[in-house]
């Protein structure tokens, strides 16, 4: 709705008028595949930390504070968080396609076209949740005649907003309170994220060891990389699926930020090239997202100095975010320049945000928090965010270093926050220009690798352990 209103206002001085019509794409798309309405299942409190009833109390307080009688939730991930449910409607995000509404008296309605299992039916009945088909939303609002409904213009489709306007006496346009509650992870969710990142780190480290023992003669390609990573993650406890389609781009493909290899466009790995691997996993206790840039087969051919320089500048920016401390109230765009500084010094930059929010067994991209030039959300305690500066030279190579971080209070100063790094996997030392790092940056690299080794070594065997020890060996200036 917000985008529609913005567009409408931009042409207000013209004679253009708007008319509602049926979606033309739906009329033309004759062989449209059926939506995957998977079974809804309950997400256990041992992973969520808060029961549905506890979350309901938080939301009702917000409804009362805003002097409203209901809250309409248009984002499926907010409904899934609020009701502690998940589904498999999408390939990489455990979502249920749905809308929901909660009244200040505690009545809850979920609108979806899913068949409900007996277990979920019982769960809904016990928690005063009524399930209705999406097609009944207009009739529902017509019969209810709410006096004042909260809904978020940024996330509510125009058609649904029109129904609310038509049948509610009044409304309030505010950010959905679920979004911020969901973004600020509780202690159980943070503990789950830490544990999930250990297992994910085991899979990724075993992958890096495997790759380091290959050569150009093995004729590996980008799809081989995707398949190997998936096989290793599938062995880990609580793994459900990748958290997004793996990006494995070598050479010029690495410069395509959201590259996807397929059988018609799939490069072989060559010595001296860089391989950018951006991947992640959905685990019952957390969601991961990690990028490593790897110098391919360095024993056969060294990477050139330009690539090492660019990698080191990206690393310096990554470290700057990881080590930042900031006052409560700081917003994402205030932190973003820290990551770009060392590239900008050379007239370079990257055309994406430095960090996005990440869910807890939900979306790998989650708002409202971000570290970017557009990031206006205050960074709050418990928010999990990616730290992923990069550099991309078109038609040649791409570099990105990504760890997930969680905002936490500083031990000695409750008025300031800092970040704790969650991701555990070696950073390729073959690409670091050590003489470009200052003492504090070297200390960070060594401390990070020390933590990686201490945490993951117990899961490595024989040659894997020897390789990990060497990969995490301290660098000296």
Regions found by a protein language model. Name each.
Residues 1-477:
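Active-site neighborhoods and metal-handling regions in enzymes and metal-associated proteins
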């Amino acid at each position: 709705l917000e985008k529609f209103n913005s567009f409408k206002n931009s042409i207000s001085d013209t004679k253009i008028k708007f008319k509602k019509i049926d979606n033309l794409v739906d009329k033309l798309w004759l062989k449209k595949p059926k939506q995957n309405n998977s079974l809804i299942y309950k997400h256990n409190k041992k992973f969520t930390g808060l029961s549905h009833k506890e979350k309901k109390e938080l939301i009702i307080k917000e409804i009362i504070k805003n002097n409203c009688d209901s809250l309409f939730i248009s984002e499926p991930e907010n409904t899934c968080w609020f009701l502690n449910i998940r589904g498999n409607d999408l390939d990489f995000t455990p979502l249920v396609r749905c809308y929901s509404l909660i009244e200040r008296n505690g009545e809850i309605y979920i609108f979806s076209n899913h068949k409900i299992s007996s277990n979920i039916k019982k769960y809904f009945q016990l928690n005063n949740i009524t399930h209705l088909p999406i097609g009944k939303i207009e009739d529902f609002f017509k019969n209810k005649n709410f006096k004042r409904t909260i809904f978020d213009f940024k996330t509510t489709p125009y058609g649904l907003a029109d129904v609310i306007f038509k049948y509610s006496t009044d409304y309030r346009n505010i950010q959905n309170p679920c979004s911020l509650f969901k973004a600020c992870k509780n202690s159980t969710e943070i503990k789950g994220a830490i544990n999930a990142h250990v297992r994910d780190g085991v899979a990724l480290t075993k992958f890096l060891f495997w790759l380091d023992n290959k050569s150009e003669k093995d004729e590996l390609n980008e799809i081989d990389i995707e398949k190997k990573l998936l096989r290793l993650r599938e062995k880990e406890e609580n793994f459900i699926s990748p958290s997004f389609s793996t990006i494995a781009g070598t050479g010029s493909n690495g410069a395509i930020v959201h590259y996807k290899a397929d059988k018609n466009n799939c490069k072989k790995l060559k010595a001296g090239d860089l391989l950018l691997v951006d991947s992640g996993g959905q685990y019952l206790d957390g969601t991961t997202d990690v990028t490593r840039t790897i110098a391919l087969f360095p024993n056969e051919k060294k990477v050139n100095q330009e690539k090492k320089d660019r990698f080191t500048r990206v690393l310096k920016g990554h470290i700057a975010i990881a080590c930042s401390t900031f006052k409560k109230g700081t917003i994402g765009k205030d932190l973003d320049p820290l990551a770009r500084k060392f590239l900008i010094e050379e007239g370079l930059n990257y055309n994406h945000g430095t960090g996005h929010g990440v869910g807890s067994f939900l979306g790998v991209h989650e708002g409202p928090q971000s570290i970017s030039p557009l990031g206006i959300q205050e960074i709050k305690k418990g928010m999990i965010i990616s730290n992923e500066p990069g550099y991309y030279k078109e038609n040649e190579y791409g570099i990105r270093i990504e760890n997930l971080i969680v905002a936490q209070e500083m031990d000695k100063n409750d008025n300031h926050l800092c970040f704790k790094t969650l991701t555990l996997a070696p950073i390729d030392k073959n690409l670091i220009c050590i003489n470009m790092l200052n003492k504090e940056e070297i200390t960070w690299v060594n401390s990070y690798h020390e933590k990686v080794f201490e945490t993951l070594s117990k899961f490595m065997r024989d040659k894997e352990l020897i390789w990990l020890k060497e990969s995490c060996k301290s660098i000296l200036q």
